[in-house]
Amino acid sequence: MKTTTKKKPAPAAKTAFWSDRNFALEAVRVTEAAALACSRLMGRGDEKAADQAAVNAMREALNSLSIDGTVVIGEGERDKAPMLYIGEKVGSSFGPSVDIALDPLEGTTICAKGGVNAMAVVAMAEKGGFLHAPDVYMNKIAVGHGLPDGVVDLDDSIATNLKRLAKAKKCDVADLVVCILERDRHKELIAKTREAGARIQLILDGDVAGVIAASMPDTGVDLYAGIGGDPEGVLAAAALRSIGGQMQGRLLFKTAEEKSRAKRMGISDLNKVYALEELAKGDVMFAATGVTDGSMLKGVRRYPGGAMTHSIVMRSKTGTVRMVEAHHNFTRKTWGDV
């Protein structure tokens, strides 16, 4: 009797996370959880408590996902952040391998003071999709889509950039609005921007929202410029990959140790200007949920037994931008079920 050996089926290949349309909603659930948790501390004046609440909730939500995730942009270096540190593994470990950039509470001061534009943010990409760098400052400049390539350049003066932008938009420099973080380090930038004739929108915190505002058509912001965190720069780049725009960033190192860490991470040119596609490349997904009201998202609305959240989720592969309004019934679920 002739026998045949039945071949075992080949193991299923890991599918990219963005190929699953349901994953967009899963990403939103991560930011919703963080926003809901820290919203209870909005306006209470305790930045650390609000940030920790967001971190705890986001970590729990990430660990519920069917991914093999690695935090590459997080709460800081491993020796300085107990949770969601750079290099931490998150997710069930079963599923697609993804790199994760996150900020559980973008705008901790904003949240503590009850200001505008605080939000929870997460971005995901294929392995190697995000710039891998130490947690340092980054000088940034960004504009929206539909403009000539190279309309702004980080190596040029703010006056030169404004003149080129005004010409591209067929308007006067006086018609332009520049978003800048209100910091002492920006006194010269603010003075030169006003000297050039442009108007300024100063923000207390939250430069992810500031960069995105420069890329959205109805925010009234034409340009973002200034120095903020490197993590926020990568997160903003992830959003711009979906909604379109131009952005450049240069890492700023203050100490020899920061330079040494950068070299250990594979950065050889410490003065390099990174283009948008070098900050966030490949297929990228970005999600954010408002904690307080802002130019892009509404803040959490709490009511007896529940809350309403307002989120945005974007995919660079399709360019699709979805706004998600969710009503959460706390009588039927726990924080982990968000």
Residue ranges and their predicted role:
Residues 21-24, 45, 109, 148-150, ...:
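A short glycine/serine-rich beta->alpha loop
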Residues 95-106, 110-131:
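DPxDG-like acidic metal-binding loop motif
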Residues 71-75, 100-102, 111-113, 132-133, ...:
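General beta-strand structural signal in soluble alpha/beta enzymes
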Residues 30, 34, 116-118, 231-235:
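Catalytic-loop motifs flanking and including active-site residues across diverse enzymes
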Residues 125-153:
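Flexible glycine-/small-residue-enriched beta->alpha junction loops
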Residues 90-91, 120-123, 220-224:
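Short basic, glycine-rich beta-strand/loop surfaces that mediate nucleic-acid
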Residues 2-101, 163, 167, 208-209, ...:
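N-terminal subdomain of lithium-sensitive/metallo-dependent phosphomonoesterases centered on the IMPase/IPPase/PAP
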Residues 155-315, 325, 330:
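An extended, acidic
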